[in-house]
Every structure is written in C-alpha cells, then in structure tokens.
Curated annotation (Swiss-Prot):
InterPro entries: DNA_mismatch_repair_MutS (IPR005748), DNA_mismatch_repair_MutS-lik_N (IPR007695), DNA_mismatch_repair_MutS/MSH (IPR017261), DNA_mismatch_repair_MutS_C (IPR000432), DNA_mismatch_repair_MutS_clamp (IPR007861), DNA_mismatch_repair_MutS_core (IPR007696), DNA_mismatch_repair_MutS_N (IPR016151), DNA_mismatch_repair_MutS_sf (IPR036187)
Region (Disordered): 799-822
Keyword DNA repair included in the entry's annotation: yes
Alphabetized Pfam families for the sequence: MutS_I, MutS_II, MutS_III, MutS_IV, MutS_V
Organism: Pseudomonas putida (strain GB-1)
The gene coding this protein: mutS
Protein name stated in the entry: DNA mismatch repair protein MutS
SUPFAM superfamilies: DNA repair protein MutS, domain I, DNA repair protein MutS, domain II, DNA repair protein MutS, domain III, P-loop containing nucleoside triphosphate hydrolases
HAMAP family: MutS
Function: This protein is involved in the repair of mismatches in DNA. It is possible that it carries out the mismatch recognition step. This protein has a weak ATPase activity.
Family designation: Belongs to the DNA mismatch repair MutS family.
Chain residues that bind ATP: 617-624
Length: 861
C-alpha cells in the first residue's frame, strides 16, 4: 500500500488533496473520483492493476516523479469492488462533492464509504446463502471477550470464552471474514493466523468508551437488559466493532438494535476438526456439494438458508426450544400445510438484508420494489398461518404481522420495474409528487415544443430546409443550410458553424432551453430528495419489520424441515432423561442421496450398559459412514429436525467429537500423525459422559506397536470417561477390550468373498470381524495382480510364523465369527488377570472377598 507522507508541498494541488485523504487510510486501496473515472495512484495502482487485470500507466509528474496510475469507469465500480472484496481487500471510495464549474483549484472531495469484506452490504458483493460476519477479540489466554456482527442483518452478539481451544473452535464455527484484534497483542498468536485478521488501536477496545457507545446505540441506560452487563471483555470487543462499522459506513446504524449474549453451555459444542469431518455446509474439498445442508436445505428464501446454516453450526441443548420446533414440524406436516406456505414464502424474498440496506441508507430502487412485493404478500400468508395451531407457529404469526400503510406507500411510490440506481431518476411513479410531475412534464413535452417551433419558424421564414434539434454539447438549435443562412431573420443568433450548415438560437428557444435543462436537473434533485424521505419513513418502522423478517425466516426453515421430513423419510426423535442413544434403521442423509442402490440402514444402541462400540471390518465396508451417520442424526435432533431413522431415542449430548481422517498441516509444520494426536488429545481432555465421540483408525500414522498402544490406551480412557463412543479400528487386538471393560462391546461390518472378489454387505452385526479383507480391497483398487499374489505369499508366511491371536470368549462360541490369526502384538504384555492379581492387597481381604475375586479372575481367563 502507499506509505503515508507528511510533506505535501512538493506535490501539485490535486495530489496534495489526494495525499491528505490517503494518509487517513494507508492500508486500504483508494478509488479517487475524477470525472467519469475512479483513478488509483502510486502503490495502490500497481496492486490494483495486478488484482483487477487492468492496464497500469503513468500520469504526468508530482514531486518530480511520474505517478503510476490505473482507472475504472465509475459505472463499472460494483463489478471491480466485488472482485477485490472476494480477494479480501478493503477499498476507500473518495467522491467529488464540489461543483467543478465553481471550484477554485481542485474539486472538493471526501471519503464517502469504506468497503471491507466484513462490512459490505451491496447485494452484488455478498453470498446470499451465507452470513457475512465480522468479529472482534479482547482478553488473554485465560479468558476472551468475543463480539460478532453481521452488518447485513443487524445480528450482534457477545460471549466470553475460556482458553484458546474453545475460542478457536468458536471462530471455526463462525468463520468471520474479518477479525479485529488489539494492536498491542503479541505477534503470531493463533487468532492472527486466520484470514482477515486485522489489528486495531488499543483504545478502540476501551471498555468504558465501549459501554457508553453501546448504550447510546441501543438508547438504554445500561446493558443489563441484554444479559451482558458484566461481560467487560466482550463489551470492549463489541465497542470496537461498533466503532469500525460506523467508520466504514459513514452513517447511523439504526438496524443495530440489540446485543445477544451467547453461551457455550446452551449449545452442543463441535470443534473445528469435527465440523470439517461432518461436512455440515462445506465439504472436505471446500465446496458445498454433498454436504448436510445441500441435502436438507430447500428453503424458499436466502435469509432462511442462512438461518438453517446457523442452526446446523450451533445445535442447541435447550429441550424446550427443540420440542417447540418438533411440534411445529408435526403441525406443518399435518395435511401437508407446508405445501401451501412455501410458495407464499418464496414471494417474501431476502427482506432481512433489504431492511439492513434501508437502515444503512444505501438501499437501491429494486430493494424497495422487492420490499413492496413482500409486504403485499403478507396478508395472504397471514391467512394461511391462522390454521397453524402449534404454539410456536402462532407466536411467529403474531410477530410477522402485516403493514398495509407501508405496502400502500411503496405501491404508490415505486414503479413496477425500477432501474438499478436512483442516479438517473425514473424510479418514482407519476402521481406520487405533483412538483416532480410538473418538472418531468417540461422535459417530456420538449419534443412536441420543438416540432411546433419548427413548423412556426418554417412558416415565418419561408425556409423549407429549416430544422430544430438538440445535442448534449451545444443544447437546442435551429439549423439552416449554408446557402440559406444569409436569409436568417435578425433575431437568429449564430451558435455553431458546420460543414454545409449553420446553427442558430433565438431568444424564445434559449428561454425554453434554460427551462428544460433546469427542469431536468431539478427533477433529478427532487426525485432523490423524495427517495431519501421514503427511506427515512421506512427506517422509522425498521424495528417491527426486522422482527417480522426474523419470524418469516424461521417459519421458512420449519416449513423446509417439514418438507424434507416427508420427502426424505425422516422421523421425529424422542429426547429422554435416561442417558442413551438408540437408533433403529439409521441412515446417512447425504450418502443415501448420492447412491444409485438402496442404502443399508443399521441400528445402534448405547446406554448405561454399553457406552462404547469397537467397530471392525474391511476398508470400504461402511465403518466411517456408520459413525458419521450417527453424529449427523444426533446433530439433526439437536436442531429440532426430524432424523433419517425409523426411530431415535436419545438424551441431550454436550459435545460431538470426531477423529476421522487426517492430513498433514504443512503450514503449521505438523505431520499427519501429529494432527491425529492433537485431535485425540483434545477429545481425551474434554469428553464427558454426555459426549458423542467418533474415533476412526487411531494410531495408524506411526509404527504398529506405538499405534496399537496408543489406540488401546485411548479406548480404555474413553471407556472410563463413559462417553458415547464409536471406535473403528483395524487393530484386532482391541476386540478383547470387552473382557476388561464391561461398558465396551464389539460390532463389525460384514463382507464376503466370491470368486476372489469382495462383496461389501454393509450390515452392522455383533462381535468382531472375522478377517480384514485387506488384499481383496487392494485388488478392487487396481493394485497389479503380481503384487497381490506376492502379498498373499507374504501373508501366508506371516500367519504360519506368528503366534495365534488369543480369542475372546465371545469369539469361541459356536458359530461366532473367528478373529483372524495374526501377530499378537501384545504377546509380551501381562494378561489382564495377572495385572489385576498383582494389584490385590491380600492381607486386607476377607475369605468371602477372596473367593469372589477368584471367580472374577477365572472369568478373565
């Protein structure tokens, strides 16, 4: 970016003006209005030319040096801004506010708006289906205050979070496009590594100033009513956001009306790894296809899609809210009521963001036309909602309301299909304002006046070739061929000489010209004034309109979930007090949609008698799908949705952990195994007896002995924590865990071989798998036949030279699947019975206790 300079004297007057403005925004690209172009100078020009793929040139000299520059036409601004914002750049728009005709020296200019990725509101610069968030942080490693603002909706929230781990998980959930941190924080903190991190002056986070600014914004005496009066760190962060928003928007922010206190205790917590692995709204490749939201989002409005995304990324533990949503979905399914509502909801559009632009006073004519259509659709929607008896839906209907006066005002004011901008007029209907109509009539009647004048002048002069016309440079004129110019009457005043013709003007035509051109500029000014007044009228009704938009978005989400329940065969889960997770015929909602063959549904049962399932079976057998579908079913239940299962009974969970698949973190300098162990450590430190834990192939990133040892110890620890755990592994040694851990059970995904080909059956059955089918999977993947044959030779030799694996009691039973013979990697470890025997305090035992212990030891053999 351009470095600030303090000495302007060597520069031309215009460049002095430029530098005075640029010094206030050294880190942002400045678009400097000059006539019909926005010009960009110096280092800004070099950067912009590269990013926008436009020509870099030079303009004259200033301070003895040529000025690098590039430029864009003013009417093409939005397209270039969209590209820069997507690249994470911020842009300062500097407009001419003085009159070039009357200015002495450079035309007066000032910064009118600042566009940053987190504060854009223009429709063209936003992703309509995703929140555009900006966040601010204050605190230290022990406690952080986090404030989050969506300027395009007015949603403003605060919370305080303990420790980096929880903070980074929350930032992963929110994914803000900008993150403001104090400039006096140490460098290279984890938060600063996020894209969009920006440092701000420490005084922007001053807590006392923040409290005053927030109270002034919300017109309250204090912040107690928002439940955040004691969150001093979060208040400091919120004050920084408010300052930043006002600085960039250069206007009041009436659509920011309240502050919401969010609490982690109210939600099901997912860390960053779990969120990525479950592919809630972004797949592992960074796209949106084949995600949970891509399957369950058929919302009619963009604002509802954004709300659904928030629900998916912030599942709740509030049973009252969840049951209200379930009741609403049942009601909407009854007699297929959602089918009547959805077409009407589609007419509403994205009024949430339209209202925000109205609050920011930058709403465009088409925004008002869409709001007019939405308000016009409300009465019919309200009539349909009167049939909905669910209490929560009745509340939404009451909040939605109707606005007949505003609908009538917009109907009278805005033409049916207005232009994109107010700049050139043509937005307001005839009859809306008499003075505007009179001014427009003068311009519109100019054509007839010229026809009449031409006829009169031909008759008066007898010159048949006389013409009356107009051009933008010279205005109105009477044109005569050169040969007839000498016959012009004495009141004809020569205006322009052309090849073969002369142009004149008369006092009458000059008077009309002054009136017509004045009327046009006055009409544009009058229409802009009326348009601004219309925005102010709408702003005075902003609070109830925003409440209505929020209610309509929720109604749209609930109607969508009802439609999905019907068409995806989803059923209502039942929350119970007893700690359990019981799923009958559960399915993976995304995989089911992409398969060309029927999905194989499976059961799952976890309760006080079984808290962990050791899952074995071949690769591609369905272990990961089985685990992920369990997590998605639990997550959907915790947003109030129906779930892909014949039935589901569960208690509230506090967290969902997934350790499924890993890759190198090259930027962070961490290997695959290091990433895997970091995720495992997070789970072991934070899982509780109310957590759902998915562990897939723990320990595979290191040597066999180390990996198996870590997997075994991690499984034991999770069993002791009593977390609901699905533990998939290829270490068959772990299938003996149920012998020493009574809350652990074995299940496996079955498969069979036919003509040396593997067939995956995808059924989950009790007990450990009978074999791994590793060579069959390798053959299926296309490994050369010669390699497969050689592998079979090695396998045979290994199996004959290795000790047979000790079979667990369940595996010895008749018809039970046999654990394959393979090296017992823990052959040198003491038997569980010997371990237990070594810990006994024999002198402290009674004879009866000794006999009971003897029986326990016998059962371990």
């Amino acid at each position: 970016m351009n470095k600030a300079i303090s000495d302007f004297t060597a520069h031309t007057p215009m460049m002095q003006q430029y530098w005075k403005l640029k010094n206030q925004h050294p880190d942002q690209l400045m678009f400097y209005r000059m006539g019909d172009f926005y010009e960009i100078f110096y280092e800004d020009a070099k950067k912009a030319a590269k990013l926008l793929d436009i020509t870099l040139t030079a303009r004259g000299q200033s301070a003895g040096q040529s000025i690098p520059m590039c430029g864009i036409p003013f009417h093409s601004l939005e397209g270039y801004l969209a590209k820069l914002v997507k690249l994470g750049e911020s842009v300062v728009i500097c407009e001419q506010i003085g009159d070039p005709a009357t200015s002495k020296g450079p035309v007066e200019r000032q910064v009118v708006r600042i566009i940053t990725p987190g504060t854009v509101s223009d429709e063209a610069l936003l992703d309509e289906r995703r929140d555009n968030l900006i966040a601010a942080l204050l605190g230290d490693e022990r406690l952080f205050g986090l404030a989050v603002l969506d300027i395009t909706s007015g949603n403003f929230s605060v919370q305080e979070i303990k420790g980096w781990e929880n903070l980074l998980a929350e930032l992963e959930r929110l994914n803000p496009v900008e993150l403001l941190i104090p400039d006096d924080w140490p460098r290279d903190l984890p938060a600063e590594k996020r894209p969009g991190a920006r440092r701000r002056a420490p005084w922007d986070f001053d807590r006392d100033s923040a409290r005053k600014a927030l109270c002034q914004q919300f017109a309250t005496k204090d912040l107690k009513g928002f439940g955040c009066d004691k969150l001093t760190l979060a208040i400091g962060a919120a004050g920084c956001l408010l300052t930043y928003a006002k600085e960039t928007q250069r206007t009041a922010l009436p659509h920011l009306r309240s502050l919401r206190h969010e609490r982690l205790d109210d939600t099901v917590i997912l860390d960053g790894a779990s969120r990525r692995n479950l592919e809630l709204d972004i797949n592992l490749a960074g796209g949106r296809d084949n995600t949970l939201q891509s399957v369950i989002d058929r919302c009619q409005t963009a604002m509802a899609s954004r709300l659904l995304s928030r629900w998916l990324n912030r599942p709740l533990r509030d049973l009252k809210v969840l049951q209200a949503r379930q009741d609403s979905i049942r009601c909407l399914l009854d007699s297929y009521r959602f089918e009547k509502l959805q077409p009407q909801l589609k007419e509403i559009g994205d009024i949430e963001r339209i209202l925000a632009r109205i609050g920011l006073r930058n709403a465009r004519p088409r925004d008002l036309a869409r709001l007019r259509d939405a308000l016009g659709a409300l009465p019919e929607l309200q009539n349909a909602m009167t049939e909905l008896e669910a209490p929560h839906l009745a509340r939404l209907a009451a909040i939605t309301g109707t606005y007949p006066e505003l609908a009538s005002l917009l109907e009278r004011a805005i033409i049916d299909n207005p232009p994109a901008v107010i700049r050139d007029g043509g937005v307001l209907k005839a009859g809306y304002d008499n003075e505007l109509d009179d001014l427009l009539a003068i311009s519109e009647n100019a054509g007839q006046f010229l026809i009449d004048l031409e006829a009169r002048e031909k008759a008066r002069t007898g010159l048949a070739n006389l013409k009356v016309g107009y051009n933008r440079v010279h205005g109105y004129f009477i044109e005569l061929p050169t040969k007839q110019a000498e016959q012009a009457p004495g009141d004809y005043i020569r205006r322009q000489t052309l090849k073969g013709a002369e142009r004149f003007i008369t006092p009458e035509l000059k008077a009309f010209e002054d009136k017509a051109l004045s009327a046009k500029s006055r009409a544009l000014a009058r229409e802009k004034m009326l348009y601004d007044a219309l925005l102010e009228t709408l702003i005075s009704h902003l609070a109830p309109l925003q409440d209505s938009a929020a209610a309509l978005a929720e109604l749209d989400v609930l109607s969508n979930l009802a439609e999905r329940a019907l068409n995806l065969d989803l059923n209502c889960p039942r929350f119970v007090d007893e700690p359990c997770l019981r799923i009958v015929q559960g399915r993976h909602p995304v995989v089911e949609q992409v398969l060309t063959t029927p999905f194989v549904a499976n059961d799952l049962g976890l309760d006080n008698s079984t808290r962990m399932l050791i899952i074995t079976g071949p690769n591609m057998g369905g272990k990961s799908t089985y685990m992920r579908q369990t997590a998605l079913i639990v997550l959907l239940a915790h947003i109030g949705s129906f779930v892909p299962a014949a039935s589901c009974e569960l208690s509230l969970v506090d967290r969902i952990f997934t350790r499924i698949g890993s890759s190198d973190d090259l930027a962070g300098g961490r290997s695959t195994f290091m990433v895997e162990m970091s995720e495992t450590a997070n789970i072991l430190h934070n899982a509780t007896d109310r957590s759902l834990v998915l562990m897939d192939e723990v320990g595979r990133g290191t040597s066999t002995f180390d990996g198996l040892s870590l997997a075994w110890a991690a499984a034991e620890r999770l069993a002791q924590l009593r977390a609901y755990t699905l533990f998939a592994t290829h270490y068959f040694e772990l299938t003996v865990l149920p012998e020493s851990e009574p809350l652990v059970a074995n299940v496996h995904l079955n498969a069979t071989e036919h003509n040396e080909r593997i067939v995956f059956l995808h059924h989950v059955l009790p007990g450990p798998a009978s074999q791994s089918y590793g060579l069959a999977v390798a053959q299926l993947a296309g490994v050369p036949t010669v390699v497969i044959q050689r592998a079979r030779e090695h396998l045979g030799r290994l199996e004959t030279t290795s000790l047979p694996h000790e079979q667990p009691p369940a595996a010895k039973a008749k018809d039970a699947p046999q654990v394959p013979h393979q090296s017992d990697l823990f052959a040198s470890l003491p038997h569980p019975a010997i371990e237990k025997l070594g810990k006994l305090q024999l002198d402290d035992m009674t004879p009866r206790q000794a006999i009971e212990m003897l029986y326990q030891l016998k059962n371990l053999l």
